[in-house]
Each structure stands twice: as C-alpha cells, then as structure tokens.
Regions:
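Select transmembrane alpha-helical segments in multipass membrane proteins
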Residues: 24-35, 67-68, 97-111, 142, ...
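Membrane-interface helix-loop-helix modules in multi-pass membrane proteins
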Residues: 17-84, 209, 221, 226-263, ...
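Helix-loop-helix module between adjacent transmembrane segments
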Residues: 60-150, 210, 289-299, 317-319
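A generic transmembrane alpha-helix motif of multi-pass inner-membrane proteins
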Residues: 1-3, 373-439
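Hydrophobic, small-residue-rich membrane helices and short re-entrant helix-turn-helix hairpins
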Residues: 85-93, 153-162, 217-246, 263-271, ...
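Hydrophobic alpha-helical segments and their helix-loop junctions in multi-pass secondary transporters
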Residues: 2-8, 113-116, 120, 124, ...
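Membrane-interface "cap" regions at the ends of multi-pass membrane proteins
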Residues: 1-44, 150-156, 166, 172, ...
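Loop-to-transmembrane helix boundary motifs in multi-pass membrane proteins
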Residues: 98-102, 306-345, 350-351
Length: 439
C-alpha cells in the first residue's frame, strides 16, 4: 500500500481527495472507498457472530445498518443544495449555533477514537488473547503500517488504496466462503433457538431504528458525501449500500458454518471457523480482517486530520497539522490496548446514544433553530443510551421475549422521546419568532 499510496502536499488532495489534475473522486473509487470504510473488521466479526446465533436473520439484521448509507448520501445532497454547507459541522453551526457544532465535533472525535481500537483489536485477536504481549504488539504494528502510508497522502491516499483493498477484500471473502461453507454440509439458515422473538427479529427492528443516526455520526462515511457532484455521490452511496449489505449477509454464512463445525463457541465465529478449517482458512480470515480493518483505519486517520484542520481550524500549516493529528489519534486510539480490554466496553458509543441525531438530519432546515432543538434530543439520547447500557432493568418493560427485548424497548422509548423534545423546541422557537415579527 505504501507503493500505491500517492504523496500529496496540497489541501485539495490531502483533505478533499482530488487527484493531481484537480478532479473529484468518481463513482468507482468513491463506491469502493465507502464500502471498505464501512466493512469494519468488527462489522465482519459481528455479522459472523449473529449468523451463528440467529442464522440468516442475524445477517439480515446487521445488514439493515447499511440501508443508512444511501439515505445518508441523499440527505447530505439535500443539505448541500439547500444550504451550501461544505460539511455537517458547518451545517449544524449555521442552523443550531457554534455550541452545537462543537458538541457534534466531540461526538465525531469519540467515534474516530473508537474506530482505532475496535479494528486493531480484531486483528490482534488472531495473534493472541486480549491483553497478551502478542495481541498488543500485533495491534500496534498493524496500526503503524496503516498510518505509514496514510501519512503520505491523507484522504487521497485513503481513496486510492481503498480501491485496491476493495478488490482484494471481495476476493478474500469469496475464497473464505468457498472454503468454509463446503465444510458444513448440514449448514442451517435457522436461528439456534425456536420462536418468533428468538429469530433475531428484535435486533432487526433495533437496526431499523438506529441505521440513519448511526450513519450520520460516522465522519468516515459523511465526509465522502461532500467530495463529488450530486449525481456521482448518490450513485456511489446507493451502490455502496447494496454491496455492503450483500457482503455482510454473505459473511454471516461463516457464522452459520462455525455453528455446524463446532469447536470453541466462546470465541468469535470467524476464529472458531478458522480453527476448524486449519491454517489455510486462518490465513484467509486474517487477510479479510486486515483488509477491512486497514481500510477503516486509513479512513479514520484521514477523517481525523480533516476534523482537526478544516472543522476545528487548528494549526497554521494544514497538511503538517493533519499529519500530526493522525499520529496523535493512532497513539491515543490504541491506549485501551495498553491499559486493558475492560476499558473498551466503557468507551463504546452505543447506537442508542446517538438516536438524538435522527430528528436533526431527518428534519432539515434552511433557517436557524434554537440551540435547545439540538442539545435536548442529542443530550437525552446520550443519557438514555448510557443508562440502557449500565442499568437496562430501569425500564420496567420489554418488547418481545428475545435476547434483545430490553434493547428494543429502550430504543423505541428513546427515539419517541427525542422526536417529542425536538418538536417542542422547534415549535417554541417558531412561536417566539412569530411574536418578534408581530412587534
């Protein structure tokens, strides 16, 4: 990747992904970049684990998150056309004020931070147990290798290498399936437990609630919607959503195969399947994880540099400051590996916590709104999401009887409340504006 990644020194290439002639990214490279940036190493692992537990429904439930990609692309095109905003941070600053924009930036930076350790941890798990020397060392080496080529060209380097990684990822996933699935002739698409709610339907409903706000809190995805023209952007986002969802469903078959072949069910499904398949499948699985994790990491580093330099306006030498911010994120993002794996769960931003972004981006506006219309729903969802993770029993009822019955109930309550408080603040703002107009 070091040889393929271009070296750039201009703001247009380093932060906006333009080529040497000044052209914006076209459909093929933009589509490939979106797909591999959103097929995280952790996503592939989750897809396989859900396939092991819930069969085909598990894969479909996780694939629903990828519906957020084309919807996100379409909504950002509307933002660009109606307001002329050059980023989501700029849009929020115009409509809800600078305080709201800074809070949104904090959410983005936490997300980018989480992307580092959540992907390096998956790669490290193929070299040793969490917390072991081999686990930590492999995670750090992997981070360093990705950082090395991303420093050369920023977003342009990320886009170019993503195209190569996309082709290799497709090949690796197909070879993995061709190797694993035939070893499980009795593979079942059904869930492990019988019953409607045990089929994973509750998880699918949670994904439907979360898919749009989840997409909008990921700068790796949203940044790319500002790089090219409207037609190119929507075509790329539509194709990426279809391809990404398809890959997730396909990889859930690895989990179904892992359930059939048996082995240590306490480990992640890809590791379980790899252990049963021998050295060959282990090497293939490691390739899949390194390709998906690497593409996400380089996108994370380039989005970090853009957030620091263009959104926060830090530094006087943009490209140099961008490179320094990448190095800082690489170091900080791997601290959980050095401090112990328990901190990973404590720092994860759950999908419930960002449900407050749903009304912000589904109810677009050209006019200024009260800051409370941003802080109330977003703050409420952060609080409820944290409570649901720490004390899920505080909500006295559940929806259904499946494993995710409590999670579904928390999400239904949270999404309803954030829309209510958002509507109240918007209504109050219009009411106050009308009074001032009459005077």
């Amino acid at each position: 990747m070091w040889l393929i990644a271009p070296t750039t020194e201009t703001v247009q290439s380093f932060f906006q992904g333009k080529d040497r002639t000044g052209r914006n990214p076209q459909v093929p490279i933009l589509t490939a970049s979106i797909v591999v940036a959103w097929i995280f190493a952790k996503s592939i692992t989750n897809a396989a684990n859900l396939g092991r537990s819930f069969g085909l429904m598990g894969g479909l439930a996780y694939a629903v998150y990828y519906m957020g990609i084309p919807i996100c692309g379409l909504l950002i095109i509307r933002i660009r056309r109606t307001t002329g905003a050059r980023s989501l941070v700029e849009y929020i600053s115009w409509i809800y004020g600078s305080g709201a924009a800074k809070f949104f930036m904090a959410v983005i930076l936490v997300r980018l931070y989480n992307e580092v350790w959540s992907n390096t941890a998956v790669v490290g798990s193929y070299f040793g147990q969490p917390g072991s020397q081999s686990f930590v060392l492999s995670s750090l080496v992997f981070t360093g290798l990705v950082l090395f080529y991303t420093l050369k060209g920023g977003l342009r380097a990320s886009l170019v290498t993503d195209l190569i990684q996309f082709g290799l990822l497709l090949l690796a996933v197909l070879l993995t399936l061709l190797w694993v699935v035939p070893q499980a002739p009795g593979l079942s698409l059904a869930p492990m437990k019988s019953g409607f709610w045990n089929s994973g339907i509750d998880l699918l409903l949670v994904a439907l609630i979360q898919c749009i706000p989840y997409a909008f809190h990921d700068p790796v995805l949203t940044d790319r919607a500002f790089l090219s023209g409207a037609k190119t952007t929507y075509r790329a986002y539509l194709l990426a959503g279809i391809i990404g969802a398809s890959l997730i469903v396909l990889f859930s078959f690895v989990g179904m195969a892992a359930r059939f072949v048996g082995g240590n069910a306490a480990v992640d499904a890809p590791v379980q399947a790899a252990a049963a398949g021998g050295a060959g499948i282990l090497a293939l699985m490691l390739c899949v994880m390194m390709l998906s994790g690497g593409s996400t990491l380089d996108s994370t580093f380039s989005s970090t540099s853009k957030a620091v330099v263009l959104d926060l306006k830090v530094g006087w030498q943009p490209v140099l400051t961008g490179r320094i911010s990448m190095i800082a994120m690489a170091i900080l993002g791997n601290l959980p590996m050095l401090l112990g794996t328990n901190i990973l769960k404590a720092t994860t931003v759950s999908g419930t916590m960002i449900l407050g972004l749903a009304p912000i981006f589904l109810s677009l506006s050209r006019e200024q709104r009260p800051q409370g219309a941003f802080f109330a729903p977003v703050g409420l969802s952060v609080v409820l999401g944290a409570v649901s993770a720490i004390k899920p029993d505080l909500l006295p009822w559940k929806i259904g009887s499946g494993e995710n019955a409590s999670l579904l109930a928390w999400n239904v309550v949270t999404i309803a409340l954030v829309w209510v408080v958002f509507g109240l603040f918007v209504w109050q703002g219009k009411k106050s504006q009308n009074k001032m107009t009459r005077r």
